Amino acid sequence: MTFTNLSNFGGDFGNEFKKNIEKFDSLEIASGYFGVSTVEEYEKELLKIAERGCCKIIIGMIFHEGVSKSQRQSLIDLNKKLIKINEDSGIYITVKQYHGKIYKFKKNDKELIYIGSSNFSPTGFSSNIECNTLIKDSETQKKLSNFLNYLFDDREISAKLDPLKPNDDLLF
């Protein structure tokens, strides 16, 4: 299945994301950029998925490029709420530039992994022409899962926001 945000080529990736976030117990997002309005739109669902399992989001380009005050505050606020629910959940920032886009939904043994061009933003989810595809090959799924683990776990690549440090230099 491919999603391009065009009705004659799979439709909006945002609709696919919304459908899956309600069905699965775990979500990992790796995105270069994000939109405050997308964080706000999906905040309740992100918190619910953290209650059911785990919700981890890594943003890959802001350490070097910076963020607006509203972007910074939205990440800090969401991170605090996610960690309060589940310490395994949270917001991560890469210290090396990461521009890829991966969305992994999991429940029990079932995994859906999408890879493509959509950032976690309104333009990525509906208004830009993008190209995202569901990965069905089990070997590729395994490699992508390992890569996500690497992004989230390797301290030379990324760091989790610390809710006790609201002026964390990862967001400046």
Where are these regions (language model features)?
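PLD/PLD-like phosphodiesterase catalytic module centered on the HKD motif
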Residues: 1-172
